Amino acid sequence: MVNTSDFKEIIENAWCDIANISTNTSITGVIDEIMDLLDQGKVRVSEKINGQWIVNEWIKKAILLSFRIYDMKFVYTNCHDSIIGNFSWFDKIPLKFGQWNADNFKQAKIRVVPGAIVRKSAYIAPGAVLMPSFVNVGAYVGEGTMVDTWASVGSCAQVGKNCHISGGAGIGGVLEPLTASPVIIEDNCFIGARSEIVEGVIVEEGAVVSMGVYIGASTKIIDRTSGEVFFGRVPAYSVVVPGSYSSGNVSIYCAIIVKKVDQNTRNKVSINELLRDNYAATSI
């Protein structure tokens, strides 16, 4: 990571004078540099320090300030392709790959399928694969991670290395409030198709989240074996499926930890095998 103390001070001062930010042209160059650093993975909205995820609020402020000072622009692209054709958009944030050529992709060591949209300031690490998907501002996608078809990685969300974000899954984003943590998917996690992880939830290393699991900050995550209840985090190496628990005369949705596996088992056993026998008992 680069030394950002000067940038931080400039952004904090600009934030205190946000009412006049549109007339403060001197801040534009600083924000451009911060967006470039995010884009290159040299700074991050959130990072793990001494085992704890820390939010760099000043970077979120820089992104929010960019929406204040950048002008809306019309962009028209002629792909010269009979299948893709021409397309256009109108936005303040350019696309990450808008000015890239073949050499840029080779140097980045990533694979990007037609239909993948990534906004400037999102970092895509070497070995990552983007199917037709969407990655928003300030997000981080780690080495060897697959973002599958129609999946989305929200603003400032952090996805670790060797993860699989399955088709149609949503990894929630957050810019405001400034103190709110983004969704964090740690290394070696699997997020099943059409699942949604939102509101700053942390999915810890090696966890497997089945298809169609919805987890927010207030969602109960119940360990079927121990009865322990978690909020806001999926413990490391947990296997999680959708379920329900009884509350009076009704059943209320929850996520259920049906088993935990160690790292060796997680590495050796396929995801399907981990999930296959666990749908019979998803009500508590």
UniProtKB/Swiss-Prot annotation:
Organism in which the protein naturally occurs: Ehrlichia ruminantium (strain Gardel)
Residue ranges crossing the lipid bilayer per the database entry: none
GO function terms (MF aspect): 2,3,4,5-tetrahydropyridine-2,6-dicarboxylate N-succinyltransferase activity
EC class of the enzyme, as a word: transferase
SUPFAM superfamilies associated with the record: Trimeric LpxA-like enzymes
Phylogenetic lineage: Bacteria, Pseudomonadati, Pseudomonadota, Alphaproteobacteria, Rickettsiales
Residues at which substrate binds: R111, D148
Main localisation: cytoplasm
Subcellular location: Cytoplasm
Entry's Gene Ontology BP terms: diaminopimelate biosynthetic process; lysine biosynthetic process via diaminopimelate
Family: Belongs to the transferase hexapeptide repeat family.
Reaction it catalyzes: (S)-2,3,4,5-tetrahydrodipicolinate + succinyl-CoA + H2O = (S)-2-succinylamino-6-oxoheptanedioate + CoA
This protein's name: 2,3,4,5-tetrahydropyridine-2,6-dicarboxylate N-succinyltransferase
Taxonomy, superkingdom: Bacteria
